Amino acid sequence: MSDSQTLVVKLGTSVLTGGSRRLNRAHIVELVRQCAQLHAAGHRIVIVTSGAIAAGREHLGYPELPATIASKQLLAAVGQSRLIQLWEQLFSIYGIHIGQMLLTRADMEDRERFLNARDTLRALLDNHIVPVINENDAVATAEIKVGDNDNLSALAAILAGADKLLLLTDQQGLFTADPRSNPQAELIKDVYGVDDALRSVAGDSVSGLGTGGMSTKLQAADVACRAGIDTIIASGSKPGVIGDVMEGISVGTRFHAQASPLENRKRWIFGAPPAGEITVDEGATAAMLERGSSLLPKGIKSVTGNFSRGEVIRICNLQGRDIAHGVSRYNSDALRRIAGHHSQQIDAILGYEYGPVAVHRDDMITR
């Protein structure tokens, strides 16, 4: 195995059911085994799972319901607990804990909620817990639509700072035409950018239980690749597919990342106008510039301006020189209160904390 990597695995309804009307538990057992093997080798695994609606339908005995949002939410409300219970039972066989995260698109669009979701997800990973993520279908409205969990998996990959995103489906990958109706269709092994020509070959879901098709997987791949994350669309029934992806073995269709996640993030930080400014002491200046360290509250001398958590701020030395730009973990009022204090005092001063640093080194670019 190579060095530790973070992998987000999205499992569609067609994979979890095997195209039937019920969850294929034997197949899910095998997928969990593959994930557990990687987890034991030191890799960080995130699961984005579909199947709540299918699980609810199965549990209720396949009721005849109208094809409405309310019916889908009813089934999701019943099925979500059954689904997460299954994941918990199977991972516990390997002594692995899971943590459930139910998200909506609104969690991604609001800065504060985005940062909270990111911090929660990364805290789970840091503690060797496998996050299991799903759309909060029981309360979502417009979110229940084609491809929601495909796109959600791309956003989860960004939140996790993932190296790879694996979209498992009932197809081998992306083909030049629909292989179910065209025997001449060929597998596209490598993609270096999603364009209109590529979108035109994407087909639709045929399982009737899921909410995603190949076109939405292209959308997800496009988003992830632009964020610097390699994305693979592959068959969930291929033996050892998850391990193969982590080993770099060619499977399915690989969408090559356009830049590394860190490069993309630092490019954004460099270009964003600072929302405020902080001045730091000589010790903090040396730590950041010479050792590439994060900025701790202890090193902050003053805070200028009003800004929110998650905004880019300018960091200056005692002579007023602009030495770095970075994303603040705390808003301006909080930074004023904890400036000059040790990180261990943050919770006592604020009544909460978002970690021991004011600006993390991964969220900073020195000038």
Swiss-Prot record:
Keywords per UniProt: Amino-acid biosynthesis, ATP-binding, Cytoplasm, Kinase, Nucleotide-binding, Proline biosynthesis, Transferase
Q: Which GO terms describe its biological process?
A: L-proline biosynthetic process
Select a single GO molecular function from the record's annotations and give it: ATP binding
Species for this entry: Salmonella paratyphi A (strain AKU_12601)
Q: GO cellular component annotations, sorted alphabetically?
A: cytosol
Specify the enzyme's EC class, one word. Answer: transferase
Annotated substrate binding lies at S50, D137, N149
For this entry, the protein name equals Glutamate 5-kinase
This enzyme's EC code(s): 2.7.2.11
Q: So what family is this one in?
A: Belongs to the glutamate 5-kinase family.
- Pfam families assigned: AA_kinase (PF00696), PUA (PF01472)
Its pathway? Amino-acid biosynthesis; L-proline biosynthesis; L-glutamate 5-semialdehyde from L-glutamate: step 1/2
Indicate where this protein resides in the cell.
Cytoplasm
Residue ranges constituting the PUA domain according to the UniProt record = 275-353
InterPro entries for this protein? AceGlu_kinase-like_sf (IPR036393), Asp/Glu/Uridylate_kinase (IPR001048), G5K_ProB (IPR041739), Glu/AcGlu_kinase (IPR001057), Glu_5kinase (IPR011529), Glu_5kinase/COase_Synthase (IPR005715), Glutamate_5-kinase_CS (IPR019797), PUA (IPR002478)
Q: Which CDD domains match?
A: AAK_G5K_ProB, PUA_G5K
Quote the function comment for this protein.
Answer: Catalyzes the transfer of a phosphate group to glutamate to form L-glutamate 5-phosphate.
Catalytic activity as recorded in UniProt: L-glutamate + ATP = L-glutamyl 5-phosphate + ADP
Q: Where does it mainly reside?
A: cytoplasm
Q: Which amino acids does the record list as binding ATP? A: K10, T169, D170, T211, G212, G213, M214, S215, T216, K217
